Amino acid sequence: MKEIVIASNNQGKINDFKVIFPDYHVIGISELILDFDVEETGSTFEENAILKSEAAAKALNKTVIADDSGLEVFALNGEPGIYSARYAGENKSDEANIEKLLNKLGNTTDRRAQFVCVISMSGPDMETKVFKGTVSGEIADGKYGENGFGYDPIFYVPKLDRTMAQLSKEQKGQISHRRNAINLLEAYLAGDQNV
């Protein structure tokens, strides 16, 4: 079985990759390097993904995939953006992040939002490649559903009439921002150099 190393300690992301790549042995970097942590000093999802994949590829001397992803709310000028995981502060819970977002959004009628995922692939003998996927939706007025992680309970997908947290892992795996970025990665790996 082929192996994919994910430069992330976020078990939710690793689980997403496992669902999307069922024919691969998906390994989180913490299984290979204890305490692997890269400071996300970039100002964009792309910069942060590249920082992680290049650092991990150098440390392991093998090809590694990293992603940086988050939620952008149009009425909040793209917040929480690259700060999605720590929107309410360092070491805060998903619940605290959601609460801050809903409070900040208040009764705003423009609830349009998008999840963004940028995947970068780096290796010892290759130029880093970057793939971006998005999924559009709206911020719900409260939390709905029990599945997923992060902002999934408040991210409503109109075409499915569900939040991401109301979808099964398999359903989410077919439409997510990560899935859309991975589609581009897979096309590249299959030889489509125009991706």
From Swiss-Prot:
Cross-referenced Gene3D superfamilies: 3.90.950.10
| Single Gene Ontology MF annotation | XTP diphosphatase activity
| Active site (UniProt) | 68
One Pfam family from the record: Ham1p_like
**What keywords were assigned to this record?**
Hydrolase, Magnesium, Metal-binding, Nucleotide metabolism, Nucleotide-binding
> What is the similarity comment for this entry?
Belongs to the HAM1 NTPase family.
What does the function comment of this entry state?
Answer: Pyrophosphatase that catalyzes the hydrolysis of nucleoside triphosphates to their monophosphate derivatives, with a high preference for the non-canonical purine nucleotides XTP (xanthosine triphosphate), dITP (deoxyinosine triphosphate) and ITP. Seems to function as a house-cleaning enzyme that removes non-canonical purine nucleotides from the nucleotide pool, thus preventing their incorporation into DNA/RNA and avoiding chromosomal lesions.
Quaternary arrangement and interactors, per the entry? Answer: Homodimer.
Which NCBIfam families does the entry link to?
A: PRK14822.1, RdgB/HAM1 family non-canonical purine NTP pyrophosphatase
Q: Protein name, please? A: dITP/XTP pyrophosphatase
Q: Organism, per UniProt?
A: Staphylococcus aureus (strain MRSA252)
